[in-house]
């Protein structure tokens, strides 16, 4: 399966996920989590690991993050790397609504994540 996973500080990723859901419907291949004010980076990493626990080596991940090199971004990458999924992951920081909707609606039209990346970067 090809997943879109959104991560952020605060409620940005869950809020964006909610808005995307209004446009694309509720989908099991779109997930989100966030680093909340009262949460440590380690707690975020644990939550992210739980979110992606069923991902397999055959899965592909489109990781959308709010900020390049922020705690959600780096911890998500560490978890995906530990699971052996980093080579199957397209990573984009600076997520926004057009980018997220395009990722969800177009991801299954591309076998190659590099080709999808070109489309997504034109939206973001």
Stretch-by-stretch model annotation:
Residues 1-124:
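N-terminal loops that bind phosphate or other acidic moieties
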